[in-house]
């Protein structure tokens, strides 16, 4: 039986058992799509990342290609899995502080400074959601006066429904209605992913929700 090494990385953590856990397989070239999906389902973490030898896709010289799986489906791009994968490959290969990873969606530039990692990418698509003001309020469990009049789909590699909440407290008070979120996302022909945000001067506070195994989860 073939064996594979994997690493568990706690992204956005301030202690060993905090943050957002992620499984990273640094040598996944021999795994099939079905095997990767089954492994991600077995780990049952929000995402599992598989690293491959770099290809010439996107026309950029990368140190590795990566693929990201939730327990239910593959994602073309996601932030915290790419951060965790960047940390693992930088440690394993003793890379310089600047390198590129190729995701399914696009190349991602990585900058490493001690234990801090920054990602940068270019290009996005934006469009207005069909959801009415009242429908958006029902998604969040808030009053219509607590949220912006419209929500936008933003795609930098993965589409997410962005909705501005008008106070920090209301951002934390939001309770997501799964059925309403699914209904709106189906109307927009998108996966159920909601990004709530509130800005206070230079600080932006966010909560991100998706649906996994028929349940609302917060990432």
Task: For the regions a language model picked out, list residue spans one by one.
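A short glycine/serine-rich beta->alpha loop
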Residues: 12, 68-76, 210-219
């Amino acid at each position: 039986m073939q064996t594979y090494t994997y690493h568990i990385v706690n992204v956005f953590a301030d202690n060993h058992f905090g943050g957002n856990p992620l499984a990273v397989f640094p040598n996944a070239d021999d795994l099939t799509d079905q095997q990767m999906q089954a492994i991600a389902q077995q780990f049952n973490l929000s995402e599992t990342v598989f690293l491959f030898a770099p290809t010439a896709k996107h026309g950029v010289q990368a140190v590795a290609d990566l693929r990201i799986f939730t327990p239910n489906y593959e994602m073309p791009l996601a932030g915290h899995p790419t951060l965790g994968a960047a940390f693992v490959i930088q440690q394993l290969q003793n890379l310089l502080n600047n390198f590129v990873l190729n995701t399914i969606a696009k190349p991602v530039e990585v900058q490493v400074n001690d234990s801090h990692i920054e990602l940068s990418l270019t290009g996005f698509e934006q469009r207005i959601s069909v959801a009415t003001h009242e429908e958006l309020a029902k998604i969040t469990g808030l009053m219509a006066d607590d949220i912006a009049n419209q929500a936008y789909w933003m795609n930098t590699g993965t589409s997410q429904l962005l909705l501005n909440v008008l106070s920090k407290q209301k951002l934390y008070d939001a309770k997501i209605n799964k059925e309403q979120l699914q209904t709106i996302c189906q109307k927009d022909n998108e996966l159920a992913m909601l990004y709530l945000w509130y800005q206070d001067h230079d600080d932006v506070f966010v909560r991100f929700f998706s649906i996994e195994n028929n349940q609302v989860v917060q990432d």
